[in-house]
């Protein structure tokens, strides 16, 4: 936020902004930052609750403000991340390796809930499920005590049609590579407090991956609905085929390259890059506070677009454009236009950034 305020004040010094215009922008930054700070704190507390069942909070209706600035978010969520920086706080650790394997399994849902560590999900052609765990156990007196603590504080089993791994032990860092039978699943949900989540070639109806501190990266994801949320980290989906995608990060890039019908992404301190490869996409909503936005869509869609930025530039490379509204004030840029209206398939695009540039262009197939 400090950098953004300095930028606004510099524009005042250069005579490009009036004092009142600068005050309006600074108030907006402050207001958005308070909202986002409350959300970060709520998220951190939510994840730490060891007694909490594996549930997902219902998303508020409407389009919430993305908040302002994550240069100072260290005062809230990062402070909690430091609490689980195990190597610094807890000293020596014992390495524990363990494999859970279940023969000839039959389940349709996968859930993983881990306090600290990482998750990598890989489908394979075997009917077994195999979880390879590499853990660091802190505050243990011996190797045997560390192994006992690991097995005591991790749950890994199949109940009904659900396979799950769960550990809320904060003095344990558990890295899991999970091999699952290659088939379509009803649900896959992964929730970490501290650590990255990765996967490839997953085929699922409902997919959810959430972490407070870490990258979310998936290739060849096929899902009817996909949700990805992180406070501090990038979100990357490559070669995906999804119905709806919802992605949100506070500090990090959002990069989506693939096929989807509906996209809703928000970042605070990070760029957004979306490349839609097929013509069945019907809507894109992309919002960031301090980052740039670059959107690429197929050239055989009838487009209705609205682009907004306070301090950044707006541009497009579309054909047959009819400009409905255009505003280019010092603290408010706006474009509303249609394009390629002769085509039968339609797409609606909305993108907004407080300080970044926005560009809409055609994707290369």
Swiss-Prot record:
- Can you tell me which residues the record assigns to a coiled coil? 18-46
Q: Which domain of life is it from?
A: Bacteria
Its keywords, alphabetically, are: Coiled coil
Instruction: Cite a single Pfam family from the UniProt record.
Output: DUF4097
One Gene Ontology cellular component annotation held by this UniProt entry: plasma membrane
User: Under which name does UniProt file this protein?
Assistant: Uncharacterized protein YvlB
Question: Which organism does this sequence originate in?
Answer: Bacillus subtilis (strain 168)
Gene that specifies this protein: yvlB
């Amino acid at each position: 936020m400090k950098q953004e305020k300095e930028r606004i004040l510099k524009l005042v010094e250069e005579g490009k902004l009036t004092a009142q215009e600068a005050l309006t922008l600074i108030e907006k930054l402050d207001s958005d930052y308070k909202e986002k700070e409350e959300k970060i704190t709520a998220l951190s507390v939510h994840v730490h609750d060891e007694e909490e069942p594996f549930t997902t909070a219902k998303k508020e209706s409407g389009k919430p403000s993305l908040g302002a600035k994550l240069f100072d978010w260290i005062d809230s969520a990062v402070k909690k991340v430091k609490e689980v920086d195990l190597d610094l706080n807890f000293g020596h650790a014992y390495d524990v390796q363990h494999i859970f394997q279940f023969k000839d399994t039959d389940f349709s849902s996968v859930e993983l809930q881990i306090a600290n560590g990482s998750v990598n999900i890989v489908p394979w052609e075997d009917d077994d499920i195999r979880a390879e765990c590499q853990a660091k156990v802190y505050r243990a007196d011996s190797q045997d005590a560390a192994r006992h603590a690991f097995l005591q504080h991790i749950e890994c089993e199949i109940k009904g049609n659900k396979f799950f791994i769960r550990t809320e032990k904060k003095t344990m860092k558990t890295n899991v590579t999970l091999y699952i039978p290659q088939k379509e699943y009803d649900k896959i949900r992964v929730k970490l407090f501290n650590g990255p989540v990765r996967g490839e070639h997953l085929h699922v109806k409902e997919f959810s991956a959430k972490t407070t501190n870490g990258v979310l990266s998936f290739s060849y994801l096929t899902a009817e609905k996909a949700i990805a949320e992180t406070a501090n980290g990038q979100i990357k989906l490559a070669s995906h085929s999804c119905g709806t995608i919802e992605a949100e990060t506070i500090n990090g890039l959002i990069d989506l390259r693939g096929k989807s019908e509906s996209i809703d992404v928000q970042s605070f301190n990070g760029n957004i890059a979306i490349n839609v490869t097929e013509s069945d996409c019907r809507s894109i909503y992309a919002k960031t506070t301090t980052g740039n936005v670059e959107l690429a869509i197929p050239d055989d869609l009838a487009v209705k677009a609205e682009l907004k930025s306070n301090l950044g530039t707006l541009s497009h490379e579309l054909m047959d454009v009819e400009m409905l509204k255009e505003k280019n004030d010092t603290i408010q840029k706006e474009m509303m236009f249609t394009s390629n209206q002769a085509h039968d398939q339609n797409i609606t695009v909305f993108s907004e950034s407080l300080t970044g540039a926005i560009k809409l262009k055609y994707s290369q197939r």
